[in-house]
Regions:
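Catalytic glycan-binding domains that act on GlcNAc-containing polysaccharides
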Residues: 1-134
Length: 134
């Protein structure tokens, strides 16, 4: 079950401030979209087990995809798939490169590129709307 509100806390917690900061790297991308992805993929870092497809970490990247877009989000000199800061900033970079900042159909296409499931874009957008309203 997805949390209706975002967690708060320190470095290991994926809270609103992290999503807001990462979204600012992609003009037009709402922090709520990143938060919705984090909520769907790992319940904001609560479940980071490796998926059956091999996706890992709080934003559930396949290692090759993470390597392609990797960002050192916390400035420690490393971009790690299991680090919440690195993973969220990397998600923002990937989404932005796929046109998410343009909104509308481009955002939907970027979300589908993030997770190739028909149900995924509407689920992300629905949860993002809930976060925007909270």
């Amino acid at each position: 079950i997805l949390r209706p509100t975002l967690p708060t806390g320190g470095h290991a917690t994926m809270g609103k401030s992290l999503y807001v900061a990462a979204a600012k790297t992609c003009p037009g991308l709402s922090w709520t979209v990143l938060a919705a992805i984090g909520g769907i993929e790992s319940d904001h870092g609560a479940d980071t087990s490796v998926s059956s497809a091999g996706a890992e970490g709080p934003m559930q990247f396949e290692p090759a995809t993470f390597a392609q877009y990797a960002v050192d989000g916390d400035g420690d000199g490393l971009a790690r798939i299991d680090d919440p800061y690195d993973a969220v900033y990397t998600a923002a970079r990937m989404l932005c490169s796929d046109g998410a900042g343009r909104g509308g159909a481009a955002l939907t296409a970027a979300l589908f590129a993030y997770n190739h499931a028909v149900w995924y874009p509407p689920e992300v957008l629905s949860l993002a709307a809930r976060y925007a309203g909270s």
